[in-house]
Amino acid sequence: MISVMAPGSEKTGKVETILKKRVLLAISGGVDSSVAALLLKEEGYEVAGVTMCLGVREEENKVRCCGREAIEDARGVCEILGIPHYVLDYAPLLETCVIDKFVREYRLGRTPNPCIDCNRYLKFGHLLDSARTMGFDYLATGHYAKIERKESRWILKKAKDLVKDQTYFLYPIPVAALEHILFPLADRTKDEVREIARQALLPIAEKPESQDLCFVTQDSYRDFLQEQGCPVHPGPIVDRSGRVLGEHSGTVFYTIGQRHGLGISSPFPLYVVAIDVAGNSVIVSGKEDVYAQGLVAGEMNWLTPERPQEAEARIRHRKRTCSCRIVPEGDRIRVYFAEDQDAVTPGQAVVLYQEDEVLGGGVIEEALHYAN
């Protein structure tokens, strides 16, 4: 039996005594998850790697994670580290849990965040269930985030590397699941992680980060949406008075706050401020109309037993947080910003923080403007 500091325990003082505690690590073949595996092994855990196969056709293997090349990279790292490697076929789950919603949201004129849904349903839903079924004590990933013990409960916090912090994408983790999840990179920076990979002579040490949607193998998401049957009908681009200024190529190709690619001549910059799917029109206006005083959010997931009245809100990944007031409305909330926020986009997430702790989050349904 060996004693090791549980990840984050240097902050909580918790020492975990483990008898080869078993960890299933989601490994994509990238540097983050590979170093996470190495760190867990060095800490004394019994580690196995698992890669989700998302069903990309080999002749179209342009995917940056979870494709054939990624699976081979993950397998190679596991061999170097001397740990088992599993591949689970998650293609049907990806289709029903992520892609179907992705397409449906665009049909409704919203801009979804499929990475959040992947975390919600696949990684910290089905994969966590699989880990427990397979006899593992924990599921670990290479996310930059931190889980700590606070009094009698587990909390989700921002990572040490605030530039790489991924808590915006992790708010849907069920609160009861936090105690079964490990984030080995919680107190590492990206530069430190790459250096660890170099020192360990891992072949993926210089591998670039994935940027694209993992399930879009075409040159652009536009092609993907058309393949999925999204209606693409040209229509008018209008100002708030209804005056036609130009023509759009399909409402699914536009998002709130978009400025470029409108094809409109104007003496001042114009931005997309609304998408009218029923009328097949895109509404544009000046920069001042991009700002909102608040939002309505649904599909809430709370990670704290108390419902806060004030918090810091983040409406996009890497956008700075702003102070806000929270008003509950049944299973939804209204969020009122201390400072107006630009491009509040239905379909994206709003995540609520108290200092470094994630309080919860939800899906933006509506932006609130002064005229409402």
UniProtKB/Swiss-Prot annotation:
The record's keywords, sorted A to Z, are: ATP-binding, Cytoplasm, Disulfide bond, Nucleotide-binding, RNA-binding, Transferase, tRNA processing, tRNA-binding
Q: Which Gene Ontology cellular component terms are annotated?
A: cytoplasm
Positions of the region Interaction with tRNA? 164-166
Task: Cite the Pfam families for this sequence.
Answer: tRNA_Me_trans, tRNA_Me_trans_C, tRNA_Me_trans_M
Per UniProt, where does ATP bind? A26, I27, S28, G29, G30, V31, D32, S33, M52, G142
Q: Show the disulfide pairing.
A: C118-C214
Q: Which InterPro entries match?
A: MnmA-like, MnmA-like_C, MnmA-like_central, MnmA-like_central_sf, Rossmann-like_a/b/a_fold
**Enzyme Commission number(s) of this protein:** 2.8.1.13
Q: Which CDD domains match?
A: MnmA_TRMU-like
The protein's location, in the record's own words, is:
Cytoplasm
Q: Which reaction does it catalyse?
A: S-sulfanyl-L-cysteinyl-[protein] + uridine(34) in tRNA + AH2 + ATP = 2-thiouridine(34) in tRNA + L-cysteinyl-[protein] + A + AMP + diphosphate + H(+)
* One GO biological process term: tRNA wobble position uridine thiolation
Gene Ontology MF term list: ATP binding; tRNA binding; tRNA-uridine 2-sulfurtransferase activity
Gene3D superfamilies in UniProt? Adenine nucleotide alpha hydrolases-like domains, HUPs, Translation factors
SUPFAM superfamilies to which the protein is assigned, alphabetical: Adenine nucleotide alpha hydrolases-like
What broad class describes the main subcellular location of this protein? cytoplasm
Top enzyme category: transferase
Q: Where is the active site?
A: C118, C214
Which positions does the site annotation Interaction with tRNA cover? H143, Q348
- Which family, according to UniProt? Belongs to the MnmA/TRMU family.
Q: What does this protein do?
A: Catalyzes the 2-thiolation of uridine at the wobble position (U34) of tRNA, leading to the formation of s(2)U34.
Name of the protein this chain belongs to: tRNA-specific 2-thiouridylase MnmA 1
